[in-house]
């Protein structure tokens, strides 16, 4: 996994996401989710490409149920973009690299 992608927990979500100084793309995922696994390498590439501009954080919905419930995550993968501790955009489902890059560009 890229050094710029952070795996967070319910306990660390505040510090890793809500208190972050840069925009944060949060990937809600699960190990059993094939589409989640499909976009993982793309997110790694994007984390390197957008280093310093966007922080990418992964939330495993099976171990971080409180956070998943708080943000009403019903389908995965779900990508939420946070700015200043608030959700500013959401992308649900797997998407090609070009669409994910455009999602980031439109929301940073």
Swiss-Prot record:
<dbReference type="GO" id="GO:0005829">
    <property type="term" value="C:cytosol"/>
</dbReference>
<dbReference type="InterPro" id="IPR017937">
    <property type="entry name" value="Thioredoxin_CS"/>
</dbReference>
<feature type="domain" description="Thioredoxin">
    <location>
        <begin position="2"/>
        <end position="108"/>
    </location>
</feature>
<comment type="function">
    <text>Participates in various redox reactions through the reversible oxidation of its active center dithiol to a disulfide and catalyzes dithiol-disulfide exchange reactions.</text>
</comment>
<dbReference type="InterPro" id="IPR013766">
    <property type="entry name" value="Thioredoxin_domain"/>
</dbReference>
<dbReference type="InterPro" id="IPR036249">
    <property type="entry name" value="Thioredoxin-like_sf"/>
</dbReference>
<keyword id="KW-0676">Redox-active center</keyword>
<comment type="similarity">
    <text>Belongs to the thioredoxin family.</text>
</comment>
<keyword id="KW-0813">Transport</keyword>
<feature type="disulfide bond" description="Redox-active">
    <location>
        <begin position="33"/>
        <end position="36"/>
    </location>
</feature>
<dbReference type="Pfam" id="PF00085">
    <property type="entry name" value="Thioredoxin"/>
</dbReference>
<protein>
    <recommendedName>
        <fullName>Thioredoxin C-2</fullName>
    </recommendedName>
</protein>
<dbReference type="GO" id="GO:0015035">
    <property type="term" value="F:protein-disulfide reductase activity"/>
</dbReference>
<dbReference type="GO" id="GO:0045454">
    <property type="term" value="P:cell redox homeostasis"/>
</dbReference>
<dbReference type="InterPro" id="IPR005746">
    <property type="entry name" value="Thioredoxin"/>
</dbReference>
<keyword id="KW-0249">Electron transport</keyword>
<keyword id="KW-1015">Disulfide bond</keyword>
